[in-house]
A protein has these predicted regions:
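Multi-pass alpha-helical transmembrane bundles in non-GPCR membrane proteins
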Residues: 1-248
Length: 248
């Protein structure tokens, strides 16, 4: 229509004045819900991680001994697929405002799911009492965090990061148990801590919005996404080592 053409011409004229290229305008319309052009890599890191997480999860399930541990690995795989898959869809797709809001809420909640999903199979390295206590505690905290995120989606960025960090380091309280476990040991503890450090480092970059090395291609948000993938990889290897140690 004439109205849409007039609006498009006005946007193009404003973009020319601000020095924004047509390619950046297209990216802005397709991807950015905040009115800012997104880097070209936005969403692609998690898009690539999604099929890799599926393959890794299937391997863990096949290697796990016992129905309980297999289900625990399935929980970990599901949580990782939901995180990476939803993030890729959210950042790459051109969605309506309602769909964007739903994907954004899920995106903000997923890291809590992945942390709880990680401790679900790892805790099989411990005695049943501690295993059940950790799994129950993690999922109760996750449920509370999810409720907060659903109700207060517009919470300040710093609050999201604070809750994220507290949740991420909460497992430190159990590291002594994993260290002494014959089915885990120092290597598993180091991997769990390294994964947590990757999550925290990424969260700090996300909160500070810097470093922002190449804003048009690979910015601060991509560093955050890289941190989540690196943390996931560390934890996936830790789960693999526990599974191998639990073989009869």
């Amino acid at each position: 229509s004439k109205a849409k053409m007039a609006i498009a011409k006005g946007e193009a004229r404003a973009a020319k004045i601000e020095g924004i290229t047509p390619a950046e305008i297209e990216r802005k319309i397709r991807l950015d819900v905040h009115g800012r052009p997104k880097p070209a890599m936005r969403g692609w890191i998690h898009a690539v991680a999604t099929p890799l997480a599926l393959a890794a999860g299937i391997v863990l399930i096949c290697l796990a001994h016992g129905i309980g541990l297999k289900w625990a690995c399935a929980v970990f795989m599901t949580c990782s697929l939901v995180l990476f898959g939803n993030s890729a869809c959210y950042h790459l797709g051109d969605w309506s405002p309602r769909v964007t809001d739903v994907l954004r809420r899920i995106d903000h909640m997923n890291i809590f799911l992945l942390i709880a999903g990680t401790y679900t199979p790892v805790s099989f390295a411990l005695e049943p009492f501690w295993r059940n206590s950790i799994i129950a505690g993690m999922w109760i905290c996750t449920t509370v965090a999810l409720i907060i995120h659903v109700i207060w989606i517009s919470a300040p960025r710093w609050l999201y990061v604070l809750v994220y960090i507290i949740f991420g380091v909460s497992g430190v309280a159990f590291m002594g148990l994993f260290w002494m476990s014959p089915y885990a040991g120092p290597t598993v503890v180091i991997l769990l801590c390294a994964g947590g450090a990757c999550y925290i480092a990424g969260a700090i970059v996300y909160a500070l919005r810097k470093p922002d090395p190449w804003p048009k291609v690979f910015g601060f948000h991509e560093i955050f996404h890289t941190g989540t993938v690196a943390g996931y990889a560390c934890h996936m290897v830790a789960i693999y080592m526990v599974i191998v140690q639990l073989w009869p």
